[in-house]
């Protein structure tokens, strides 16, 4: 795989996720009727810029970037030492760094505190509606896992941050590692299984050179998810994704279809909504993100996940430049994409 193509898809995944996050963050806690009164009949359709001309990201993009940084730092540490821990261990310490940016004191000193560029970025040291489950789990001093759940939460705070697990193949199964990264804070299968599937989809899209239809990628990833975890909650989640795919083939208005899937406050609903919007608008990033956020639920998370999916498929070069120009922290996002690309290229021995 060419390095330039790898970077385009990694950067596309991170940037489009941030665009969807920013678009939805402005209406995260608003009902659909309130959104229409504020933005018009079609809802929000433009970047919600503030006085400085920039739209704000939320905790979704913050945690996604820390996931990315934890993976990169962990890779180079393991490479230098010749042996390393499982990737979720490195990600856990990255989340402790994020926890510090929220004004909290972690129960242990994060491994990455001296070297985290993100921790030293002033604009990231701010609260953007962080999830209570994430904060509570990280304050506990315990690292949750799929086998040893830290709680019974199926909130979408697990899935909204795990796209980067699809970037690296050297850590093993993206499906399993994405689930483990979510299970650090979210112990219910409905919280970590969608995260695993998102990571798996991202990996298929980043490394897919056959330009397979997005629906084929979704169904292949869903099949792998059900095969890996034969659990009632996982099968229930799979049924929801199938329903989302079928709804995307109807003439039902996007808002009605999304409300039929749920509010996106929990992991399975959030991924299903994102899948719906991406399948409905597979070649139009703006349309997909507008679709994914305009509803009465967790708009920033559904927008972020939809952006991760389409960005991984279409790449940075396909994203709307006018929206990127209106987004804060694009330099930080692109730097993280470059750092990840360098690590992946090294692992794959790309020139």
Protein language model regions, located:
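Structured, active/binding-site neighborhoods that engage oxygen-rich ligands
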Residues: 1-351
